[in-house]
Amino acid sequence: SLSEKNKAAVKALWSKIGKSSDAIGNDALSRMIVVYPQTKTYFSHWPEVTPGSPHIKAHGKKVMGGIALAVTKIDDLKTGLSELSEQHAYKLRVDPANFKTLNHCILVVISTMFPKEFTPEAHVSLDKFLSGVALALADRYR
């Protein structure tokens, strides 16, 4: 679980990187479909599933919008993300293992885009936070 120190570190990092969330989302989603090509199956209804394509950019923006929401709901991720959990479980039918895959890609992108801000403390806190987000999103799968 997230300590108060972790929560403060996530909020502090987000205050510095949040304005770049669209670029982070595009890069993270682009990285995911290249490094983990099996994830492309979730986007087979798109005319083009390539890094940086308009659909990837748009979905990356949505994903990071969800992360931004999670930052505001950091004290109760399960309740705060319940609608997103329901959508991913029943409508989109995303395998929850893919949340961890995308989380890893988000961490890699943030570390490369913001090396000064991505301190060891920020890394640990953000990793724990994203794991909490993944757990909250997987809640409705049970």
Curated annotation (Swiss-Prot):
The keyword Iron applies. Residues 1-142 form the Globin domain. One of its GO terms (biological process) is hydrogen peroxide catabolic process. The modification N-acetylserine is found at S1. It comes from the Eukaryota. Red blood cells. Transmembrane segments: none annotated. Belongs to the globin family. This fish has five hemoglobins: Hb C, Hb O, Hb 1, Hb 2 and Hb 3. Hb 0 presents the strongest Bohr effect while Hb 1 presents the weakest Bohr effect. This is Hemoglobin subunit alpha. It comes from Pagothenia borchgrevinki.
